[in-house]
Every structure is written in structure tokens, then in C-alpha cells.
Amino acid sequence: MPDELTEPGRATPARASSFLIENLLAAEAKGAGRSTQGDGVREEEEEDDDDPEDEDPEQARRRLQRRRQQRAGSGPGGEARARALGLGPRPPPGPGPPFALGCGGTTRWYPRVHGGYGGGLSPDTSDRDSPETGEEMGRAESAWPRCPGPGTVPREVTTQGPATGGEEAAELAEAPAVAAAATGEARGGRRKKTRTVFSRSQVFQLESTFDLKRYLSSAERAGLAASLQLTETQVKIWFQNRRNKWKRQLAAELEAASLSPPGAQRLVRVPVLYHESPPAAAGPALPFPLAPPAPAPPPPLLGFSGALAYPLAAFPAAASVPFLRAQMPGLV
């Protein structure tokens, strides 16, 4: 019993080894060698029979091409070799579905997939590959979007090319005009106002009027504008600017006064402490009449930056001035 169980176990690898890739390739190579030997003999016979002396070179080339296709497609794996060599049936150039070697390529061989290989899709071997039929190719081409071939031109470009090109040219021509209009509008909105240049006589008249009145009524503004040959708007704007300048000057003066020391701007009044004596008091004592006294000057107002005031009585020369003045006529 154990010997009988072990013998099938040993035979299983032998049976499974027949499906290995090396065995399959070896069998395929043997079949290809036999077919090439038979094809060589048939080719020699056909060349002896089908080569007329007066055959055209173009016809000879076509005949040789057909022989190569027949020779490549015969035997096991012939279709795969024809597909690899590009000798299979060549469809017209044009778009094709995926799995083709480029749109409009030389081959139209599509690997068939079947279910049941592990529950998924398994491609068949190269021996079972075959070109698609006309119906299948039509369905495949209609299911997938077409892409242009080497010598084809896109339909949209040929049909709508001139129209779209004209529209693009018109849009490009209109673009600078639109940009220029937009910049013109922007510049128009940002345009600076022109400044009015006043003459000296106009400025003098305006300044004198401003010293009298800070604000003008509409009638006064109209009369002043007519006399100065200006518009009422110009006179109005000038007075507005002048009032703003006047307010800034007042604010600057107040700020300077607040920052200066407190005793620097104080004014001090200094009274005059002497008076000339009347002539009646000195008349009887003197043998000659006195000259009439000079009129007394008005009391001066002296201002000092400091806080101290110095009276004139502190100076003896200033106190003896009347006596010297009274004695000067006698000395002469």
C-alpha cells in the first residue's frame, strides 16, 4: 500500500513538468525548425516555377512579400512571429482603441481575455492570438475615441480653422483698443486739477479783502471775482486755502507760546520817578529870570525781558539833571 501511494506521488511532477515554460518553448522550437525546412524546399520549388524572366521588379517585390507572410504565418506560433515581424494583415492607417501599438500602427492584434483564470482576467498564449474580425474591430473602434493618424488632419481644425483663426485675430486686434480705453478711463479719473496762477495785483487785492473779512457772502464773492477777472469758484477756493493757512499759523503760534518759558514774553511797565520843578518856586531866590523849561516828555514805557525793573532814581546823574540845566545860563 505505501508503495502504491508513493508511485502516483512521484508521477505527478512528471505530468506537471510537461506544462513548464521550458518544455513549451522546446516543443515550439522543434515545430518551427521542421516548418522552416519544409518551407525552404517549397520556396525553392516555387522560385523555380514562379520566376518568369520578364517579371516587373514591383511585382517581384510584392510576390516576395506574400511568400514571407505565408512562411511566417505557417506552423505553430506563426501568427506571433508575423505580428512581431510586422508581416501580418495591415489595416488602413487610422485611429485605434487601446492595447494597439500606437494609433494607426501596423498591427491590429488584440490579446483576448477570458474569465476563469483564478477568478480574474488571464490572457491566452501567443499561439491562440488571432486578429479581430470586422464586427469586433468596428465595435472596438466605436467604443474608444479616435486619435489622428500620421497623415490625417484633425476635423475640427479643417472645418473650423479659418473661422476660429479670424475670430482670434479679431480678438487680438481688439485687445489693445480695450486696454487703451481702460487706461484712458483710469487716467481720466485720476486727472490732476489745473492750478490757477494769480498775478501780484490779484493776490494783493485778495489779501487785503481777507484781512477785512475772513468769509465772503455770495454777492461779495461775485463782485470781487468780477473786479479781478476771475471766476467765483477760483475766489472761493482761494479763500478756503487762505483760511486753512491762517488756522495753521494760529496753531503754530499757540504751540510755540506753550513751549516757551513763562517769563520770556512778559511786558513790564516802568514809571518815570522824577518831575521838573515849577519855575515859580525858584523865581524869587534867583536874581535873573530862568529860561522857560522844556516840555516834559511823556512817560516812557520800557519793556524788559527779565522780571526786574530798574528805576531811574538809582542813577545820581539822572537825578541832578534839573539843577545842571538851571545853572547853565548863569555860567554863560
From Swiss-Prot:
It is found in: Nucleus. Keywords: Developmental protein, DNA-binding, Homeobox, Nucleus, Repressor, Transcription, Transcription regulation. The keyword DNA damage does not apply. One of its GO terms (biological process) is negative regulation of DNA-templated transcription. The keyword Nucleus applies. It comes from the Eukaryota. InterPro entries: HD (IPR001356), HD_metazoa (IPR020479), HMX_Homeobox_TF (IPR051300), Homeobox_CS (IPR017970), Homeodomain-like_sf (IPR009057). Residues 28-170 are annotated as: Disordered. One of its GO terms (cellular component) is nucleus. Pfam families: Homeodomain. CDD domains: homeodomain. DNA-binding protein that binds to the 5'-CAAG-3' core sequence. May function as a transcriptional repressor. Seems to act as a transcriptional antagonist of NKX2-5. May play an important role in the development of craniofacial structures such as the eye and ear. Belongs to the HMX homeobox family. This is Homeobox protein HMX1. It comes from Mus musculus (Mouse).
